[in-house]
Regions:
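Mg2+-dependent phosphoryl-transfer enzymes with acidic/Ser/Thr/Gly-rich catalytic loops
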Residues: 1-4, 15, 20-21, 189, ...
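Short, acidic loop-to-helix structural element flanking the phosphoryl-transfer center
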Residues: 18-34, 81-87, 153-157, 180, ...
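Active-site phosphate-binding/coordination module
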Residues: 22-136
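Residue-level signal for inorganic ion chemistry
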Residues: 31, 42, 66, 171, ...
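Short active-site oxyanion
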Residues: 35-39, 59-60, 170, 229-230, ...
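Residue-level detector of anion-binding/catalytic polar loops
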Residues: 37, 101, 195, 250, ...
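Conserved acidic, metal-coordinating active-site core of Asp-based
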Residues: 98-100, 108-231
Length: 307
């Protein structure tokens, strides 16, 4: 029986318009009402992930930064696996060599070692064109984008960030030019103690080797006394592979997932635009109800046998 449902966010829980559908919202609430744990396992930072849950009036625990930090429903962080500053320095040096913008996640949330104008230029020239090319939505409104920018913590250069005590959870970047991102990937793989994955052809996410969605999910399940066989995990992209390749009760790929993701999963769900997450939840609840009926019938049969 499934006791923990773990869902990726972009391309999975969210549809291509960037929000959680009414059917999926109702399914998640019903799942939680039946006592089954629901957790979001995302590459987003806490604020960006919570923004979407708040818009849907949903609340749950979250694994953010692709496994680097887990948050309870109140926003308290635990199970933290940050990048050592020495490793972060190597990564940032490689980024500089390739002219890559360093999109950094720390305990402050989104963090930058450049100025605001450079950040805005990065989104205009790299992120937005890449997201548009994929047909996805990351910010539903300009207000959402403006709010994100207003929350960014700016440092004066990498030495300023590396010299403070704040932990670095993740360093990522996006290039609209795929040749540039591929060259960066080749260079990054020469650094030890890191885990580098992509959610699309245009991006790169880097965390500590112990900060992976799969590792974080198993750690979280242990705190709830839930075994791997009682977990359903669903996702669509490369940063989901560490959890979808685990020996879990069910591993599901969305219909819109990459071929690599589909190859490691036991189930293919409908796409994120066809309420794939809701479909999986409804199936779980239906199976649980059927199992409950069988148990009731069995108990009733035993009672009659004693007459």
């Amino acid at each position: 029986m499934i006791r923990l449902f773990a869902s990726d966010m972009d391309g999975t829980l969210l549809n291509d318009k960037g929000y959680i559908s009414d059917r999926t919202i109702n399914a998640v609430k019903k799942l939680q009402k039946h006592g089954i744990h629901f957790i979001v396992n995302t590459g987003r930072d806490y604020r960006a992930a919570k923004r979407e849950l708040d818009a849907a009036s949903l609340s749950c625990d979250m694994i953010c930064h692709s496994g680097a930090c887990t948050y309870d429903v109140h926003g308290n962080g635990f199970h933290i696996s940050s990048l050592p500053k020495s490793i972060a320095k190597q990564i940032l040096t490689v980024f500089e060599r390739h002219g890559a913008f360093a999109d950094i996640a720390t305990e402050y949330g989104k963090t930058s070692i450049t100025d605001k104008n450079t950040l805005l230029s990065y989104y205009k020239n790299e992120v937005f064109p890449a997201v548009e090319q994929e047909g996805k939505v990351y910010f539903r409104t300009w207000h959402d984008f403006a709010m994100m920018v207003s929350k960014v913590r700016f440092f004066e250069g990498k030495e300023s960030l590396l010299g403070c005590k704040t932990p670095i959870y993740k360093i990522s970047t996006t290039f609209f030019d795929q040749d540039k991102i591929n060259a960066l990937k080749d260079d990054i793989h020469g650094i030890d103690q890191l885990h580098a994955v992509s959610t699309s052809k245009n991006d790169l996410e880097i965390t500590h080797v112990n900060a992976q969605k799969g590792t974080a999910l198993l750690r979280y399940a242990q705190t709830k006394k839930i075994t791997p066989s009682q977990i359903l995990a669903v996702g669509d992209s490369g940063n989901d592979l560490s959890m979808l390749s685990l020996d879990l009760g069910v591993t599901a790929a969305m219909a819109n997932a990459s071929a690599t993701v589909k190859d490691v999963c036991s189930v293919i769900a409908p796409s994120n635009d066809q309420d794939g997450v809701a479909f999986l939840i409804e199936d779980i609840l239906e199976q649980n109800e059927l199992a409950a009926r069988v148990r009731r019938s069995f108990c009733l049969a035993l009672d009659y046998s004693k007459i």
